[in-house]
Amino acid sequence: MTSVWKTKVLTGLNKLFDKDGKKAAAAEFLKSFNKEEIGKEIDDKKTELEPKVVEVVESSPPEIKALLKDKKTASKIKKNGPAVTKFLEELAKIDFPGAKPVSDAVAKSGTTPLSPAIAFILEKVAPFVPKEEPKPEPEAEAAAETTSREVAVEEEKKEEEAAPAEPAAAAAEAAAPSTEVVEEKKEEEKPAEAAAPAAEPEKQ
């Protein structure tokens, strides 16, 4: 009976009190967490912090990058608890204002009861994240390729139509002199025909 008390009942009570203790500690921390002061300090050190924060963000896992872009809700922070805890530790290393006390509090109470403070830090980190250039949509790329192909085909057709026209022009030029020769021969034959009738009356 004693062993059952120690292993089940006492352990359950300890967990209950421990959980309540963490909540109480988190509540006390949130009361003393001065957002205005931390926000002002971040603004003052913005130029100094930017390259350090960018480096930390770039080396962070995808879930943190997604969390920085989306709304920092308590459920999302809880879902990504281990990654958030690690990220806060990295921010504390570069002396990001507010990160160190929040990181220490998370180590004692967990991420869930401290989600308001964590969300505040993440919101302050978000503006430092470099914006990604929008990638062109696949449909737009396909349309551009189709258009370029159609233009190329049309140009090829025009070249093919223009090519036969040149030999035809050359043939016409070659035929022109022969036509002139025929006309000259006809003109020479006409005087001969006219002279023949004139000679006939002399014979009579």
From Swiss-Prot:
Composition skew (Low complexity), residue ranges: 164-180, 193-204
InterPro entries documented for this protein: DREPP (IPR008469)
Stretch list, region Disordered: 128-204
Induction profile: Up-regulated under salt stress.
Entry superkingdom: Eukaryota
Start-end of Basic and acidic residues biased regions: 147-161, 182-192
Pfam families in the cross-refs: DREPP (PF05558)
GO cellular component, one term: plasma membrane
PANTHER family recorded: PLASMA MEMBRANE-ASSOCIATED CATION-BINDING PROTEIN 1, SALT STRESS ROOT PROTEIN RS1
Family as reported in the entry's similarity comment: Belongs to the DREPP family.
Protein name: Salt stress root protein RS1
